[in-house]
Amino acid sequence: ATEDTAVTYTAAQLLGNGWPCARDREEITVVGVIAAPAVERAGRTDFDLAVRESSAQRPLPGLLRLSWYEAPTQPRPGQLWRLTLRLRCRQGLANPGSMDRELDLLRQRVVGTGYVVAKAPAELLRDEGLAQPIERLRARIAQRIAASLPAGPSVSVLQGLSVGLRGNVPDELWEAFAATGVAHLMAISGLHVTGCSLFVLWLLRLCWKWPPVGSLRGRIAAEIAVVLAVTAGYVLLAGASLPALRTLAMVVLVAIQRLLRRALPLHLTLALAAALLCAADPLAVTSVGFWLSFVATAALLLILDAGSGWRA
């Protein structure tokens, strides 16, 4: 009941903040910060804008998902722009077996969609160095990858696998991934996050074998601090998808248990991780990825538990 109330309240609040359909295609002038790395498509640039000021005579507490056709320059995270926009309400198709776009926009706190009016002046006011630091770093890594490799689909694939920016992957490549059954590998999930955590832990265990540091006390606390810091940083750089956040929550819970020298059953740890995610974002339960992630992990735990019983 508590979860239902939280979901209902959050959804009602977000729905009330959305751009009204009665004002579709209305032009407004806004001042806002680029909130995420832009995606270049054929003839247009897609990006999210966090509005600070607007002529709309109503608050816009969320993101605007915008397209800019023939943009003179690529907007970068942290830049403050004054733009004239033509907005539409948050709408989308919801066909059986396909993604519910309107619900997806709602989960991402997008209050409206639209495009930059080409004939109106667009002004870059300043680059706010402290705004959107994680997104700025993601964009910088993606740019370095693009500059280091010859142009081609491999650039977008590496950007997707490293910092979770998959918007530049060509449609034909997605079709090839789907046909060969490897599309899921493009999503940074629990496999990647767990691998990162275990690799860092392995490096630390190697360091403890070095005599100058091998005799230091507090090694368990040091391991936990370093592993959590690196894992959290990787999840943020990867875009903080639901599967990655689920794994991070489980890593945090396991670390706490190790620090307290207490062990909980894995299924209870999984349940606590789900509760943490729902507390942080009640709308997570509306995502297919949430259920796939937790159900798949629960199934693996059941299989492992059954396997241990057979061995016994």
PLM region descriptions:
Residues G114, L165, V169-A312:
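Hydrophobic alpha-helical transmembrane segments in multi-pass membrane proteins
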Residues A1-H184:
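Membrane-interface helix/helix-cap signal primarily in integral membrane proteins
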